[in-house]
């Protein structure tokens, strides 16, 4: 199989779909890899490293898309990339379609088979290709939130860890999944007072066992969220409904009642965000202020630590890339129902129910397009 690795073109996105080490594994199995020149130069992987691993270096993205059977990326394709996709081609990347009807319709028109990292599952019901970036985003959320609380960034001038004689700041984490747990761990580590809200009692019990008295846990109700949001210095939105748009847990009225200079970090912004006042931002302009509250809503947070993120993501995606290449996409999905859960669009139709439901588009089950 011919596998294409383009350079990411989203603003301030430096991650890459395959590292030289991954390319070496793929080519050792008899596949051809085409990498656009400079695809990962920004994170220390130059073209010579890819050549040494067995890749062919292409001069342009057009060349990669025109010749590859399988495109391996990181972020959702931008409009000019969607225009390069063609019928019969397979795209393997993060898509986050439930909040992006324009992208979804573009992928439908392309005729390509589109497999989303974020909806691939495992036997435990977890999301193995989302987890590495959720870990990164969760840990980053406290880091960037603490920075945004500084006065020069528009924040209230609060040091989350406090100092002797001065109380530590209050961090509220909405969602106790992978990103929320990592956010809580980081916030605890710097000495903040941490509260996690989740709708799963078993998950709250696990967090209580993991962190003990260092974290307060609350069952998710509107009243609990409202009270905790208003009282917090930093609120981290880490809510996930796999493949679907994020629920708006924090209303405009709640934001209005927060203290001036408080900070919201919306990890869920890829799926539409979980604050009513959220809208996507970039690393170039990461924040804005609404109702006196600083909002950080960067859609590709892990791109800021692109080398770490690329290595972590590659560890998770490589086995699936190998399966797609060795078996062909159709047989790989038939053999692996967990990989099949990643199929979001095929030959002009949406094959992931939550995406179709959120966007009001026709739905066809993945099993029917596979003929099983």
Question: Predicted regions: what is each one?
Answer:
Residues 5-106, 110:
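An N-terminal-biased, well-structured beta-alpha scaffold segment characteristic
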Residues 6-45, 152-240, 287:
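Glycine-rich phosphate/diphosphate-binding loop of Rossmann-like nucleotide-binding domains
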Residues 69, 75-76, 95-96, 221, ...:
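Short glycine-/small-residue-rich Rossmann-like dinucleotide-binding loops
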Residues 76, 136, 177-178:
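Residue-level detector of alpha-helix initiation sites
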Residues 209-291:
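Rossmann-like adenosine-cofactor binding region
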